[in-house]
Amino acid sequence: MTNLIDLHKTRAAIPGDLSGLQSDLAQLVGEPFRFARVSYGDELTLHFGDLRPAKSPKLKGKLYGAYVFGSRGSPWIVKSGSQSLVLTADLDGHPGEPVRKEDLEANPLIAPDSRVLAATAFVVKPANAHGVELRFSDGSTLRILPTLAEADDPADAALPALADWELASPAGLLSVGPGLTWSFAPSTRSGEQATG
């Protein structure tokens, strides 16, 4: 069966609606990888599609991909398709050697211009939350795992919930987590990217 997804409508998860989440991820398939950046809080962001200048005057000279995939504060793993190397962040046990932010950005282990072949959401049962795996044409793989819930500090009760991972696109912002929650908010103006 063929399905049409209207990316101009706001959508929120129906419990157990993994297919709806998968449909929103489909917009990333076929897009070329441009570069990786480590942002505030050591969050990994991958940039895809056409490069665009940042909209904020404070970020003048910085480029962003039309699609920006962010790990937020979640653990992630990048497996290179061309090298016997794996990068990890925020995984227990700290396997391997530390990598500087600059080294990661200079060598993200994913070949520039390799295309996204698959973007697959899955449920991580112990965390009762969504993870995601991106597969690239160079054989590389990115996997983002949800952040495990911790005991809430009463002072944190007023803070908004932080997504486990997000995809900003020309169509809008897909936010996933915490838990099995997710939402898609369309861009407010035609052609406006949700970040930058």
Where are the predicted features?
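Surface-exposed, interaction-prone regions used to assemble/regulate multi-protein complexes
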Residues: 1-196
